[in-house]
Amino acid sequence: TISEGEGEEKTDREIEVANIINNTNPLWKKSPSELSEQDYINFYKELYPYSSDPLFWIHLNIDYPFNLTGVLYFPKIETNFDIQKNKIHLYSNQVFVTDDVKEIVPEFLMLLHGVIDSPDIPLNVSRSYLQADSHVRKISGYITKKVAEKLNDLFKQDRAGFEAKWPDIGTFIKYGYLSDDKFEEKVSGSILLKNTDGQYFTIDEYKEKIKDNQTDKDGKITVLYSNVLNDHHSYIQAAKTKGYDVLEMDQVIDNHFIQHLEYKKGDFVFKRIDSDVTDHLISSDETIPELLTESEIKSIEELYKNVLKDSMNKVEVKPLSSDVQPVQIVKPEFMRRMTEMQMLQGHSMGKMPEMYTIVINSNHPLIANKLLKMEDNAAQENMAKYLYDLARLSQQMLTGADLTNFINNNLVQMSETSI
């Protein structure tokens, strides 16, 4: 049990720590030159006996303008359930004080493990006092600086090793990038973007890679991304056939990260791979000739509105490249982002259905040469519905009874087909 605060704000709190170090000459008091890699790992195991080996660590040692020693470790997080924020132990002259260091260590660094030891941090005072204390602010800034320097050193000295660690540290770095201006400034050259081929790029490297082929008519570089690679496979492949590159952005934090990059960089615009048909992902002044007449376009439009019945989703008939799928479902970037941000912030969308646009490729042979020319109305509706279901299937939207009916109808057609 430890006491925190003073006067009316003083409270007792029970804590459970993996191990309190009572060694008279603990590792963090030694010079880094005296220590081997195994020494650091052994000390980590002493602190957290049941944890996997850490990814890397930072040895803190400064005596002016404040006194601070310690070792901070980057843990290997196996699952989201491993994320705990009370893993940094605060000591004062080697005497354990607390594991609640949120007023001393920046929030984005609370995922780190380890020990910090400083006699200059005032004890048994209110949190508001701690926040205003000049030593505490300097210590917080120093820790942030050392973490950024360590990350940059790893990136410069062992790029391949840094890339291998990125799945474990990427979310942490992005969080710091978003929440601390000084940290953002220091690590901006070490932030990595991963594409769907598993290649890593810095922000500047990626900008250089795609600028020639993915700059829109307004001079903005269009960054295409997917947050669910398997669900978006057909969209990704279609983009690749046009020579486009696609990023993998599948972490919860990536929604905020994307908007931050758009705001900071100015010449970037991010579009999820299913936010529009492939021909229109990179806006340009080029037009594709329309093969159908106005009345034929109207006929296709009415057919799909009838197939979709009471659906509130928009139907658009567009002239696209003939190799683009006959029917596609796209989810406009702005509306989808707004919905996702509201859900992230805990705002319930109730039973409101997801809004999307059904795009019919009027230049596809199945639309122009077959569907449009069918005289049997029932057969025409069945084919229109089948093409729509294929589009839903490619978006993982065909589920439940609709999926069962789709499978059964295909089995019936196969059984009726002569072999």
Predicted regions and their residues:
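Conserved GHKL (Bergerat-fold) ATPase module
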Residues: 1-419
